[in-house]
């Protein structure tokens, strides 16, 4: 159900450039404990196609979240485990409490972090991500910051709110179309053959520079004024 709710939100906002970002946080001070183990238990004795269909669906939603044109922010309180932490790794910015609990716990129950693995490696690097997933290590927010799982670590609720507000202010200073193009560049570059990387980057840059936002951004800098997309909160 949570996966379908997330998919519905993504589908609603992905083409709306007036929506500048999306924040994901848990209800009641708890981010996400991961998948439905009772459902997994029933599925373990069912048809192979059923479990594969479920995994594919999760994979497609995570891919859409990762590529969402808007800036995505995960605010983590309580705990973020397994697939829930994988969702956070798809986000552009991760903020969490120092006492929150983290872990990619799949191998402890005999399964793999299949659909989230590439996003874990994307977030905290190959060596660290590999160790965390293979050993199902558990760690707190302070260590999550050192490992690169969290971008910002807060000691209390007030600090968490301030960090979230700071990220929102930064986002609202950025051109929404340029943000979308930047994410296309970041996601597309690794899969682009080396012989095509220069051309891919040049087209991305030129498309932005000669677009309405590029013209407005350069003009606003020269004229020493704020661009028309700048919004304050």
Where are the predicted features?
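A short acidic, glycine-rich active-site loop
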Residues: 42-56
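Hydrophobic, secondary-structure "cap" segments at the distal end of domains
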Residues: 118-127
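Glycine-rich beta-to-alpha active-site loop
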Residues: 61-109, 138-141
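Short helix- or helix-capping micro-motifs
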Residues: 34-35, 128-137
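C-terminal long alpha-helix characteristic of the crotonase
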Residues: 95-100, 150-199, 212, 228-233
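Short, conserved active-site loops that position catalytic residues or coordinate cofactors/metal ions
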Residues: 25, 32-40
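Conserved CoA-thioester-binding segment of acyl-CoA-metabolizing enzymes
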Residues: 1-27, 49, 60-63, 166, ...
């Amino acid at each position: 159900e949570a996966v379908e709710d997330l998919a519905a939100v993504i589908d609603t906002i992905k083409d709306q450039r007036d929506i500048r970002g999306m924040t994901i946080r848990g209800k009641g001070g708890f981010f996400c404990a991961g998948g439905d183990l009772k459902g997994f238990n029933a599925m373990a004795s069912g048809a192979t196609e059923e479990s594969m269909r479920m995994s594919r669906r999760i994979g497609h939603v995570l891919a859409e979240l990762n590529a969402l044109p808007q800036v995505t922010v995960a605010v983590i309180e309580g705990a973020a485990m397994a697939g829930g932490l994988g969702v956070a790794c798809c986000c552009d910015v991760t903020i969490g409490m120092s006492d929150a609990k983290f872990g990619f716990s799949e191998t402890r129950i005999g399964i793999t972090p299949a659909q989230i693995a590439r996003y874990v490696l994307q977030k905290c690097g190959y060596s660290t991500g590999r160790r965390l997933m293979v050993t199902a290590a558990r760690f707190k927010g302070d260590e999550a910051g050192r490992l690169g799982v969290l971008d910002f670590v807060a000691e209390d609720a007030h600090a968490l709110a301030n960090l979230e507000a700071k990220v929102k202010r930064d986002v609202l200073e950025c051109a929404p179309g340029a943000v979308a193009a930047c994410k296309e560049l970041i996601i597309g570059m690794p899969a682009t053959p080396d012989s095509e990387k220069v051309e891919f980057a040049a087209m991305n840059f030129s498309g932005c520079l000669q677009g309405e936002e590029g013209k407005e951004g350069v003009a606003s800098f020269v004229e020493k004024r704020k661009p028309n997309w700048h919004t304050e909160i």
